[in-house]
Regions:
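C-terminal motif of bacterial Sec signal peptides marking the signal peptidase cleavage site
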Residues: 18-20
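Short coil/linker segments at helix-helix boundaries
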Residues: 31-63, 67-68, 81-196, 206-239, ...
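Acidic-aromatic/histidine active-site loop/patch
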Residues: 289
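Bacterial N-terminal signal peptides that target proteins for export
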Residues: 1-10
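Terminal, non-catalytic domain-edge segments
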Residues: 292-295, 299-302
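Bacterial signal peptide processing site
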Residues: 22-25
Length: 303
């Protein structure tokens, strides 16, 4: 009887283990499906609807990560989600507050944007560490960063891109923090490696990000900036509007080229809906382009 009881215990434990495996498999499948379907938001043209979906999505992705902390798809969704939401919606709130001369509200949204980018970086670095350990040590200088990133391949391009974009964007909203500015090279290296692996990733977003980076000041590498922007526009046949908007906002602004600045932004505003896969990103570009054609924004460029 003792032998039979022992066998029943083994069978019971095996059944419990099997149920746990089934639940994990189902959860992982749901997360994978969510990642595959998450691109549907890009086809929306309604900014407010997209904003609601994006914030709700973050809650869903956080819950998935809580249930499956080692799931790479969940980590990717959180990295991309926090980065994209901060840029598309939180920074939009910040710009509106700035234009309204509401310093308190502007500072509130700037802090929100920084926190969102910090969260994106946290999840992104966690995902990178699952591929290759040693990120914190590698970020000390450009050479060690490039050596670390040599361990990543083409299928890592999107992850590198989203982490890098979050890093660069955080530096932009925290310009008054020397510690953040001192690590700007980390974001550049991440995006550069992504572009090396797949320059078409996310509709050449890496090229546009590098273009903006190299036009960060009037004393920066403006010739290199223009090359990156022109390549991004070439790769997307001019149909992805964010590279064009960013070209005007950064490069033409820093060059003091008012004619090209206005011409490019008006091209963005007047562009037809020819890229449904990037309808939301193009709607965001149009929204920002209209804002940057305002007198106050143009005055910031010295126009």
């Amino acid at each position: 009887m003792r032998h039979v009881g022992g066998r029943w215990w083994i069978v019971a434990m095996a059944a419990i283990f099997a149920v746990g495996c089934i639940k994990t498999t189902i959860l992982n499948g749901q997360i994978k499906g969510t990642r595959e379907g998450s691109v549907a938001i890009d086809t929306l043209s309604d900014f407010e609807v997209a904003r609601t979906i994006a914030y709700a999505g973050l809650g869903q992705f956080e819950g998935m990560h809580e249930l499956a902390p080692d799931n790479e798809d969940a980590l990717f969704l959180l990295t991309k989600g926090w980065t994209a939401t901060a840029f598309a919606f939180i920074e939009d709130d910040y710009e509106m507050a700035v234009d309204a001369d509401d310093e308190a509200r502007a500072e509130y949204h700037r802090a929100r944007a920084r926190a969102a980018y910090d969260r994106a970086i946290h999840y992104g670095v966690t995902l990178l560490e699952m591929r290759a350990k040693g990120f914190d040590k590698a970020k000390n200088n450009i050479a060690s960063m490039k050596l670390y990133l040599s361990q990543f391949y083409r299928n890592d391009a999107l992850t590198l891109l989203w982490v890098g974009q979050a890093w660069l964007a955080k530096s932009n909203v925290a310009k008054d923090d020397p510690a953040v500015v001192a690590e700007l090279h980390v974001g550049e290296a991440l995006v550069e490696r992504s572009v090396e692996l797949d320059e078409n990733a996310a509709y050449a977003a890496g090229r546009a990000a590098l273009g903006a980076y190299h036009a960060r000041t009037a004393m920066a590498e403006l010739d290199m900036s223009l090359k990156h922007f022109m390549r991004a526009i070439e790769l997307t046949r001019g149909n992805a509007l964010l590279p064009k908007f960013t070209l005007a906002r950064t490069y033409y602004c820093m060059k003091g080229d008012k004619a090209s600045y206005e011409k490019t932004l008006r091209e963005v505003v007047d562009a037809a809906d020819v890229l449904p896969e990037q309808r939301l990103q193009n709607a965001i570009a149009k929204r920002r382009a209209r804002r940057y054609l305002s007198k106050s924004r143009m005055a910031n460029c010295g126009f």
